[in-house]
Amino acid sequence: MEAAAMAVTAATGALAPVLVKLAALLDDGECNLLEGSRSDAEFIRSELEAVHSLLTPNILGRMGDDDAACKDGLIAEVRELSYDLDDAVDDFLELNFEQRRSASPFGELKARVEERVSNRFSDWKLPAASLPPSSVHRRAGLPPPDAGLVGMHKRKEELIELLEQGSSDASRWRKRKPHVPLRIMGGEMQKIVFKIPMVDDKSRTKAMSLVASTVGVHSVAIAGDLRDEVVVVGDGIDSINLVSALRKKVGHAELLQVSQVKEDVKEITAMLAPVKSICEFHEVKTICILGLPGGGKTTIARVLYHALGTQFQCRVFASISPSSSPSPNLTETLADIFAQAQLGVTDTLSTPYGGSGTGRALQQHLIDNISAFLLNKKYLIVIDDIWHWEEWEVIRKSIPKNDLGGRIIMTTRLNSIAEKCHTDDNDVFVYEVGDLDNNDALSLSWGIATKSGAGNRIGTGEDNSCYDIVNMCYGMPLALIWLSSALVGEIEELGGAEVKKCRDLRHIEDGILDIPSLQPLAESLCLGYNHLPLYLRTLLLYCSAYHWSNRIERGRLVRRWIAEGFVSEEKEAEGYFGELINRGWITQHGDNNSYNYYEIHPVMLAFLRCKSKEYNFLTCLGLGSDTSTSASSPRLIRRLSLQGGYPVDCLSSMSMDVSHTCSLVVLGDVARPKGIPFYMFKRLRVLDLEDNKDIQDSHLQGICEQLSLRVRYLGLKGTRIRKLPQEMRKLKHLEILYVGSTRISELPQEIGELKHLRILDVRNTDITELPLQIRELQHLHTLDVRNTPISELPPQVGKLQNLKIMCVRSTGVRELPKEIGELNHLQTLDVRNTRVRELPWQAGQISQSLRVLAGDSGDGVRLPEGVCEALINGIPGATRAKCREVLSIAIIDRFGPPLVGIFKVPGSHMRIPKMIKDHFRVLSCLDIRLCHKLEDDDQKFLAEMPNLQTLVLRFEALPRQPITINGTGFQMLESFRVDSRLPRIAFHEDAMPNLKLLEFKFYAGPASNDAIGITNLKSLQKVVFRCSPWYKSDAPGISATIDVVKKEAEEHPNRPITLLINAGYKEISTESHGSSENIAGSSGIDTEPAQAQHDNLPAVRDDYKGKGILLDGRCPTCGRATKIEEETQDRVADIEIQTETTS
């Protein structure tokens, strides 16, 4: 809340940040403000601070219908004043010393404050927030009675089947399918797919003949596993009329797809294919219907309520009105549930008892009564529109679980509630209400138009405005109904000559809040909008810059939020983006295993544009925009989005004032974007030209010459630029530079002059190195060079003291400079898909904040804590330089990234190096490779290390005698890994008292039945065996060792002990597989791709080559085990040793 109070918002504008900026200006003794100007500034600051102190708790902290407050005349004036004051301060700061001495920057603003704020503020009261009554709420979400239930039959049948038969879908979540737009492409080849049940040759002949005789059809083919799909290729085909004709001829037809022939339709087909896990049918006692506002949640719930009602002893349908907290309407809802359950009356509200209890006591009384009444009954409970999880928790407590076949249906528009229901209760199935298919959507829209008598004036083919409505509505039933009704009204008003203007739908989109026939749709959308806190509304309104055909790039949007001043930190902005997904405003497509993309429903975007226009927050100009209205608007354009089809020449030819525009976003194929008059944008702070293929080097140079010095964000991603011009150095206040996916091959030296740069993103470029001048970017907190040919980072990155995120993913980098240990604020280091296997040990200094992403996993590797500071303070400066050669932090090995990085001694050694013993006794983990034995004094040193929790011992050669671990020392050790040809080790009584994990990595060797003694490891929980695929687990030495450990595990007092043995992913039970031969016979499936195997090979350290004995007695001749380890790829299967308890 505190951070949000200081941000730019749609309601209060730049009021909070500009007050901070004005205070800093007044406190700066070197700003050379004249006495009169200082007095003006102090007056403005005093008056606006009083307004801010009133608005902050009342607007920022509340939900509800704040439109009255935010559109109030005084607040609107303060909002515009804040933007102008922000510009005035920046204008003054750009002046030189002499100009400042004669400037009077705040005189006019002071007069405005006196006239329009001060004189009105004393009697001004904040308009009261209000929520619509429950009757309005319920009306908004339902279609009119005469609209028909087009497309609801299939949903009803699916849901009834779930309730009556259960589900075989192990995910318990039926996902909504991405919408496939219905496109009419005059003159272009189309591919149209129909589904037609053709039971015999006669029906097939009828269908094929009809399709073949249709105008525009070039070819017809039969497809589908059941040969029930007709694929049509042609141009100018009226698919809706063809579907109608097919239904008359053969009884049924469904439109599956309309696309251009040149498109690859495999991607769409793959997206639409349902993915299910086959399992046993399980009972579904509760269905959570999830969907967008206007998607038909309430309608289908009512259909189910009436269709199934006779099967239940009692039934309830209760709707919940939205509120800022769950408490106001909850008692009323509980009373409604009890009344309906008792009396079976759907619209009666009654109090179930005559007591005088209030508050929680009354709620609890209702819960107890409902639960007691329903306990022995078969019930159907429908709870419509859950807004708060706390509401559902209370209602759920009142509904008892029994075995009488009771069913619960709930609806919500919030993803977060559906996900929590799904996680908390195995009996819940989440059913996402999808869009109506294009055929049903066209039928619904056309039916409303023809019912009104306007069907003959709407047009046919590509002139049929119903096609545009279907594309805009994305199959949302409520939007289809009311927009089709509005279209009829517009046609009546405009007449046939204006019908092409209707086709653009721009005037209808812009009138969602004003056209009377669209009021029910607007009310439904307002419910969700008003439920958002102000900071989320601000971020959401900014999304109105997009056209409904644009996909949203998450990182791009998040960083523009930061540049606009809505949010200060990227992590915070990412969290807000997630909130908008959870609340259903932004839709995510894809999953964790595929490319994710995001979009906002077109109807929601139209609604947001209208809201944005009310606040003068952002202006969108695109195809069909009324340019004369935009030019004549009395309010200045603060933020501008130019969308596909808008002629940029209009900007210079009209009287549109963009001198106070702070943000310009250019989306899509804007005609001649290089012709945008950037010199007119005198106060521009955000410029996004991403994916404009018309922008090249010469254009960028001219743009930089024209740009305002105040530009904070410059987005050039996806343009055709090859280099950054020297003129960029003038952008002294640039904070975010986004040049990914361009053709640039180097960063100019002038990059070091951008002292305020916070984010530098050069991903997917041809850059091969970072310039030394990067050390000058002291404010940089994000450096992203992923997918570039960069092979080395300069030591100067250690000078970036404020760096928080560094991404070198999928580059040629093999080793990171030791200077990264100086990056005390680093939080995320992404080295996935690189040859980086180790970090300098100095990186442990930042272990408390750093998360390392390594290998091909998204799970972070934590660095060992609490030792590096002690090490650095205890090691003399002269010795410290040598430590890099004897110690590093391993973040990945042959088996993927560990959960916690391990201090590793590089190379092979005859003994533990003296430097380790002298200076690194306090380590919490250690990984070291010895030649063939562990000397007694070395074991004593390891046993006495006070903090040692993880130990990895690797042996080049098979030890001649078993390594004996006695009951002395290793008091803190929890994880012990032995890497040897065979695990020649024996644990004596009371050895390693806190050891929980024992892991063996072995290859081959002579068979031995010697005891290992794991029964002496009193805290042991798991034993892991990993063996090379070159030596299968039926090799004599390996199988004998496994048998020994299995036998000892069965005798362990902590049984069952879990054994993990590399054998693919097949789970092996000791009851059915009593010998090692059976274990060896298990599948050894290798699921890791060849590239991943190659990437996981250890990096070669050049400084160790050809040096004989390398460091402190390292052995250069022992390399067999190392070689085998480098080639090892294995998989693990779970074996749980279950033994019968004997008395």
Curated annotation (Swiss-Prot):
UniProt keyword annotation of ATP-binding present: yes
InterPro entries in alphabetical order: Disease_R_plants, HMA_dom, Leu-rich_rpt_typical-subtyp, LRR_dom_sf, LRR_R13L4/SHOC2-like, NB-ARC, P-loop_NTPase, Rx_N
Sorted UniProt keywords: ATP-binding, Coiled coil, Leucine-rich repeat, Nucleotide-binding, Plant defense, Repeat
UniProt-annotated stretches for the region HMA-like domain: 191-264
Residues in LRR repeats: 681-706, 708-731, 732-754, 756-777, 778-800, 802-823, 824-848, 945-968, 979-1002, 1004-1027
TM region positions: none
Region (Structured coiled coil (CC) domain): 1-190
Pfam families: LRR_14, NB-ARC, Rx_N, WH_DRP
GO biological process, one term: plant-type hypersensitive response
Domain free text: The HMA-like (RATX1) domain is responsible for the specific recognition of AVR effectors.
Function: Disease resistance (R) protein that specifically recognizes the AVR-Pik effector avirulence protein from M.oryzae. Resistance proteins guard the plant against pathogens that contain an appropriate avirulence protein via an indirect interaction with this avirulence protein. That triggers a defense system including the hypersensitive response, which restricts the pathogen growth. Contribution of Pik-2 is required to recognize the effector avirulence protein AVR-Pik.
Homology family: Belongs to the disease resistance NB-LRR family.
Protein name per its UniProtKB record: Disease resistance protein Pik-1
Source organism (scientific name): Oryza sativa subsp. japonica
Name of the gene encoding the protein in the UniProt record: PIK-1
